[in-house]
Amino acid sequence: MAEIFDSALRSHRDFAGVFEYDGETAYFYLYRNKNDQPGEIIGWIHIFSGTVDFDEHDISIVWDKNEETVGLFIRDQLWAAFSEPWPTKHGGNYVPGATSSVRLQFNR
């Protein structure tokens, strides 16, 4: 299976939500941007391992309207999120065909 990568940078350009599937394992990361210096991953959530049942068009990374939470949506369901205080974690463990267990107020 092909690799999948997607990200969304907050408007302040200080944090990004990043999804990465390397062909075997998928993670959702919270990345801290450091302007002209290399940034760092400050949080990670395991999404799944194994064969994927979706493609890059099914993935979206969205910041809420207050930019206090960044979420990973798979087929329009919120499967993982980071919220303030950074890096508070929610969700993970995607299961094909299942409904997400993440119950988080997410205002787009």
What residue spans do the PLM features occupy?
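Signature of short aromatic-glycine-proline-rich micro-motifs recurring in repeat-based ectodomains
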Residues: 56-61
